[in-house]
Amino acid sequence: MENRSLFCYNQLRNPHKKGCAIMKKVLLGCLGTVLVLLALLIGFLAYFGPDYGIFLFPPSPQDYARSVVKKLDFGLYTDKDWENEKKKALEKLESAKTYQDTYPVLEKLTKEAGGKHSYFLSPQDNPENSPESKNQPEVQNQESILYLKVPAFTGDAQAAKAYAKKLSAALKKDDYQAVLVDLRDNTGGNMYPMIAGLSSLLPDEDLFQFVYKNGSKSAISRSDILKQLGLEQTDEKAKKVPIAVLTNGKTGSSGEMTVLAFKGLENVKIFGQPTASYTTGNNYYQLYDGAVLLLTTSSILDRTGKLYKNEAIQPDVLTDQPLEEAESWLKGQMGE
């Protein structure tokens, strides 16, 4: 009885000691749980990560190739023969010693999965390592017709905003009655600054839709374009002026997407030659070694309901003198 009393007395005198012991057990338990979860996460990433381009350690050339092929599964042109084609390709790569050894096979397989608008680019050919495009839009106002030369564009976010703002600033003025958008020789690049700069001419509706091979669709509106560049959203309605768009055989890719943003509008007419026929949507993948995969994953549906799958956009007026005929049409519209 005396010992029990002494024990109780000691417990009453040292409650802090007992609390520390409990806290220590709790902390050790939490630490153990964290370590277990961390181990599971590492195991998960080690096993599944390569399929998504995530590597905890430098991948072998074979694992590198398999991670690229996993992405190619989403290519627009993969069909019933695709599984056999990629199996043969991976067998060829079993003897690869370096990442560079895989490039020729992956380049060929990329074209098979994504068609002519798809590219496997080595680190040396990565667009991010290329000089930025020095092209900037050209603006002229002649006889109340606003001439906008819209060239190809590649560059960072700051350059994209500058490109777009040069076009939008010209369109904010009230000293014109018609607009001529010249997309001849625009071979593409980034469509967002092109369309964003011209956005005040466009209605805030679906400009076009990406259509994936499983049938799902993703619409792009004027607001989506502006949001992508971080530019100010406006509720202003599209300017109702006659618009002529000029095209030729070098109007391609993002240049063609800019044409489609206008095609089908009642105040727009397209003059020139059929475009370059790169009318599909691409996904951009940065690969482990700095190479890049540009993969076509969707066809394009315009506002008229026409589906494009690397088909040329036909002008409304087929002509070898698009500028002269466009000017004549615009002046006629202005006089009405």
Which sequence ranges carry the predicted segments?
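N-terminal Sec-pathway targeting helices
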Residues: 18-42
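Membrane-interface motif at the C-terminal end of an N-terminal transmembrane signal
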Residues: 37-57
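Terminal peptide-recognition signature
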Residues: 68, 109, 148, 181, ...
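Extended, small/polar residue-biased N-terminal targeting/export presequences
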Residues: 76-143
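STAS-typified acidic loop motif
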Residues: 135-161
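Short acidic catalytic loops
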Residues: 148-149, 170-189, 245-246
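A short, well-ordered alpha-helical element
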Residues: 156-177
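Gly/Ser/Thr-rich loop/hinge elements
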Residues: 188-242, 280-286, 297-301, 307-308
